[in-house]
Amino acid sequence: MARTDKWKVPEPGIDDRLTSLPDEIISHILSFLPTKYAVGTAVLSRRWKDLWTRVSNLDFDNRLVYRDLISSRVANYFRLTEMEDRRRDVEFLRFVDRVFSQHRNLDSVRCFRFHVSVSRAMQDYLNKRGLAFGSQVEEIDVMLLEAIVSQLCLQLPESFYTLKNLKVAKLHEVKATVNGSVSLPSLKILELWDVLAEDRESLSRLITGCPILETLRLEHCILLDMNENDVLIASIPSLRNLTIIAFLAEDDDKCLCRIAMEAPKLEHLYLEDFTELEFLCSSSPLPCLDSARVDTGRRASSYQSLVRLLAQISSAKEMCLYWNTLVMNIFPLLHKLHYLLVV
């Protein structure tokens, strides 16, 4: 069969715009690919062999190995055998080791993304090696899928709490135990999903150790050493965006943590399955609040805490209230309200 023009090899002399670029530019372009594919470009030519070793972003995802196994066997993911499952993890961890050992300068990495489905082999590796954060990293995105269900949570390394250039941290299903001081002077965005905090002091130190924090998200986080009479106190003068969803104590699905927070510059508030929040500020209601969304959810909230909360957010210009909040039949004067949505 004759080869179509689509598959013709370019003739010598025809410009290759990508290859003509400087090595630094090509490495920068490769930084936007998942690391698995960036490393794969090494087979293109002798010149491309080491270009990936200068990428400024490392993006690991063992689900890409799932896809390779599935496509090679034309099999369903849920039918992978235990042997294949272990082989997948071994291949992935060897790949991670190869990247760490061959990268030219890990301290030059600006973005570190690590998304994996946790297994026993994965936990053993991470407990032994830890997560390698370069000292100059600016963004960290760690997701350990199924870690809590499998009881295989990974402890955050001590080095995480003193990363001077870190601006964005997104952590999913890890364990945070803060034994020393926290100094994250550049962190502006902190998002925690299903994070296990050893105690309220650990979480309080983490939050207050971010002097310019603007966005905080706590979703289904759990404080392991806290009872219903304890209060988590945090001062975040720079905070502008706050999201709290089902913040629990002692892994008890019915026991909500209580939070007292100083956030005088707060502009946007989203609460779901959580209303045990009190703002500590000299002026009440919150002076800078633009929007508030409150859903008491299926977990019971105390009448007093909800009354106090609604009074403190009554300065919002836009508000969304859910029916389960309305049935409490307690509303302060909403003197700045321009828009109200009832869901």
Write out the residue ranges for each language-model feature:
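Leucine-rich repeat
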Residues: 2-6, 11-233
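Innate immune receptor modules and recognition interfaces
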Residues: 15, 27, 97, 132, ...
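A structural signal for leucine-rich repeat
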Residues: 127-131, 155-163, 180-188, 203-212, ...
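Right-handed parallel beta-helix
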Residues: 194, 214-215, 240-243, 267-268
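Extended alpha-solenoid helical-repeat scaffolds
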Residues: 224, 243-245
